[in-house]
Amino acid sequence: MGGVMEKFHGAYVAIITPFINGEVDEQSFVDLIEFQIANGTHGIVPCGTTGESATLSFDEHKQVMDLAIKTVAGRVPVIAGAGANNTLEAIDLSESAKESGADAILSVAPYYNKPSQEGIYQHFKAIAEAVDIPMFLYNVPGRTVVNIAPETTARLAGIDNIIGIKEACGCLEQISDVIRKCPEDFIVLSGDDFTSMPTNVIGGKGVISVISNVFPKGMAEMQEATFAGDWDRARQLHYQMYDMMKQMFAAPSPAPAKKALELMGVIREGLPRIPMTPIDDDNLANLKLAMKGLNLI
C-alpha cells in the first residue's frame, strides 16, 4: 500500500447526525468530523442508517451532506447516503449528493415494498443511469427485508459507475460469494463491525463502521494492519474493540453511539430522534464499562 490508503478502502465511519432542540446540531457535527479525521478515519459516510436518514427531511438530508462535504474539504472521501425505496426519490437524493460534491453515494436496497431480484436490479440501474457519480450498493437485509443476492450484485457490478457494495448481510459465506462473482476491482466493504476483519481476510477492502464514531483510531489501525498483512495486530485490535462493538447494538442503533459521544464530550447532546429512544440505565452502565475498557472515559 506504500503507506497511502487507496480511495474507498479502509475505515469509513457511518457517522451519526447530532441533534439539539430537535434540530441538526451543526457545531457538534463539525466537531465530530474533526475528531474523526484527527483520529485517522479514512472516510466519512453521512446520511446513512446510523445518521438517522429515515427521520431526516429532504432539506435536512441536504444540510447534513453539504456540511459534511464542506467540513471535510477534500481531506478524506465522502460517501453520501442517498438511498430510498422510491426510485425517483433515490435519484433526487443522488443528484443532490452529486451537486454537493460527494465523492460517491451509498444507495440502500428498496425496503418495505419487497421487490424481486429483477426489481432490485432495475432500481439500482435506473439510479446509476440517471446520475453520473460513483455508487455503492447497500445490502442490509435485517432492515430492508430483502437481500441483494450475490448474482444480482455481480450483474450490477457490470454497470460502470456501480463500483462497490456495503455488505451488511452478516454472512461470510454470502460475502465470499459476492467477492468471488464480482470483478477484482469491485470494492466490497463490510457493513458490520464484527465482520470487518474477516471480510478483509477473504478479499474485502474495508468497512463502513458504527464503532468508528467513538473509537475511530482503533478501527482505522485495524484496517491498516490487515492491508499490511499484520494479522496478529489486526486480531488484537478486533478483540480489543469486541465489547464496544456489542454495546453499539445492545440498544437500537445509533442511540448507544450517540450517548457515548455525549459522554466523551464530542457532541453536546446524544439523543436520537423519535421513533428511536435513548438507551436505558442498564445499557448505559454496560456502555460505560466498555468505554472505560478503551480509555474513552
UniProtKB/Swiss-Prot annotation:
It catalyses: L-aspartate 4-semialdehyde + pyruvate = (2S,4S)-4-hydroxy-2,3,4,5-tetrahydrodipicolinate + H2O + H(+). It holds the Pfam family DHDPS. The active site is at 138 (proton donor/acceptor), 166 (schiff-base intermediate with substrate). Pyruvate binds at residues 50, 208. The keyword Manganese does not apply. Belongs to the DapA family. Catalyzes the condensation of (S)-aspartate-beta-semialdehyde [(S)-ASA] and pyruvate to 4-hydroxy-tetrahydrodipicolinate (HTPA). This is 4-hydroxy-tetrahydrodipicolinate synthase. It comes from Desulfotalea psychrophila (strain LSv54 / DSM 12343). The gene is dapA.
